[in-house]
A protein has these predicted regions:
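Short alpha-helical transmembrane segments in multi-pass integral membrane proteins
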Residues: 33-100, 134, 140-195
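Residue-level signal for transmembrane alpha-helical positions in Major Facilitator Superfamily
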Residues: 25-26, 66-70, 100, 104, ...
Length: 222
């Protein structure tokens, strides 16, 4: 109904903002890996990508915890009525636990692209989307979970994609004898590389959120 769709719209706006701000994990990891791969430093290339994965996990965990605790406040910023806000909070609180997975997927995609492998990310994305659709159908209609089922299905699919990437990256690490432990300098390098892209995305998301806020103020009756 209208309340469900409106709540989903609010929750999606918040999630897309958070994920969009973190897109630098893919676009900073790719060149870092590609530079080393092109120079023949395959171990260093995999190492750089793994540092990106650890950064993604750290950022995602912090965002998931903070986001889950502040979900009611975030939703209240849109000024929606109680029924719409309730649906938005349900969806958003569950979806927050998929954030670490989504950010890891970004970084893993960057790693594989830097290693000149664009096929594996395509397969994982396709299978992940298919699993997401199947789980959404099962949880929403089979179990009758409503909007919570939609969020739960997406979170499970996201972590399944992480499992697939973990297997692929583990194979790469063994093949090129790269450590899977995080390195401080590598984490700092990944963060520095994405700073300007982060600022660009902040500006774009502020404009989008302002638009959603105005639309929410109009209400579902218009």
């Amino acid at each position: 109904d209208q309340q469900l769709l409106a709540g989903l719209g609010i929750a999606s706006a918040v999630l897309q903002t958070i994920v969009g701000l973190m897109v630098f994990l893919a676009y900073s990891t790719t060149p870092a890996v590609a530079r080393r791969f092109g120079a023949g430093e395959h171990t260093g290339a995999v190492r750089a990508g793994i540092d990106g994965l650890w950064l993604a996990l750290a950022l995602g965990t912090v965002l998931a915890v903070v986001g889950s605790l502040t979900t009611p406040w975030l939703v209240s910023l849109f000024g929606a009525d109680a029924a719409v806000s309730e649906q938005a909070v349900i969806y958003l609180q569950l979806s927050m636990w998929g954030l670490p997975a989504m950010l890891i997927v970004f970084a893993a995609t960057g790693l594989l692209r830097g290693m000149q492998d664009t096929v594996t990310p395509l397969w994982i994305a396709g299978l992940g989307f298919g699993l997401n659709a199947l789980l959404n159908w099962l949880f929403i209609y089979g179990f009758g979970w409503g909007i919570a089922g939609s969020a739960a299905g997406t979170v499970v699919a996201q972590w399944a994609m992480v499992g697939a990437y973990a297997f692929v990256v583990g194979q790469l690490a063994r093949r090129h004898e790269a450590s899977v432990l995080p390195q401080r300098e590598g984490l700092r390098g990944s963060a520095r590389a994405g700073w300007w892209l982060f600022l660009r995305t902040v500006s774009l998301r502020i404009a989008l959120l302002a638009t959603v806020g105005v639309a929410t103020g109009i209400g579902t009756g218009e």
